[in-house]
């Protein structure tokens, strides 16, 4: 377990939270196995995978569950879900809401920890560019502009060392009490990982039919027209795309 309590006591005055970590061997456990274990104890969980160079798996897989907070934005209305309550605010700078929240979660970067030890996990939709460039008048989609969840517990699967890092971020207001809670949570997670407890992850078996907003012929014409603009010196670069969409029937 690291850092130990003495080290945390020294760091506590400078930080709001401190990550506490324990490593265990992965053995025959895989990231998908871990995800199924988290699905057995929580309705909100995630798995982040990474690929390097488009061909090789990244070193780490990251998993988490039971977020302490959810923050979502739609058309400038930000909704914050925390401790079973919702608060709303209207803003033209929704990213600032996330930045303000993170100010209360200042944490040290500890040597030996994986590159991600806790924080927001979610997505930013294409429509977010509309807040930075309002003249573009981006059409609102069916998704939230962003949907983020704040996780204070992280399981990092190290494919290189075949080890699993169990990380719990503890608050520094009551060091001794919170350190005890963090170590207990880590032990509970270690027990869950080693247990046989799993759950099936819902998978849609429906046939998916996609529709496109631009035909292939129209798209080819756009490409040729763009080439002409570049040759004429009107532009030097353009990104032309086709939007494919499908309605979800089941999950």
List PLM regions with ranges.
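Extended alpha-helical targeting/anchoring segments
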Residues: 1-251
């Amino acid at each position: 377990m690291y850092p130990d309590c003495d080290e945390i006591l020294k760091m506590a005055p400078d930080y709001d939270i401190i990550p506490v970590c324990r490593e265990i061997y992965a053995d025959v456990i895989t990231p998908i196995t871990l995800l199924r274990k988290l699905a057995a104890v929580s309705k909100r969980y995630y798995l982040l995978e990474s690929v390097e160079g488009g061909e090789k798996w990244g070193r780490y897989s990251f998993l988490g569950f039971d977020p302490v907070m959810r923050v979502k934005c739609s058309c400038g209305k930000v909704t914050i879900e925390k401790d079973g309550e919702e608060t709303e605010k209207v803003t033209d700078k929704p990213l600032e809401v996330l930045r303000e929240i993170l100010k209360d979660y200042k944490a040290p970067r500890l040597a030996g920890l994986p590159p991600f030890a806790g924080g927001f996990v979610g997505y930013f939709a294409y429509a977010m560019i509309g807040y930075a460039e309002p003249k573009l008048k981006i059409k609102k989609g069916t998704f939230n502009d962003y949907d983020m969840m704040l996780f204070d517990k992280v399981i990092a699967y190290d494919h290189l060392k075949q080890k699993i890092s169990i990380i719990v971020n503890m608050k520094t207001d009551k060091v001794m009490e919170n350190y005890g809670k963090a170590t207990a949570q880590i032990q509970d997670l270690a027990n869950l990982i080693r247990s046989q407890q799993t759950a099936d992850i819902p998978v849609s078996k429906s046939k998916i039919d996609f529709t496109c907003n631009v035909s292939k012929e129209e798209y080819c014409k756009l490409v040729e027209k763009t080439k002409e603009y570049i040759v004429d010196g009107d532009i030097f670069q353009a990104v032309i795309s086709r939007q494919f969409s499908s309605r979800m029937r089941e999950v």
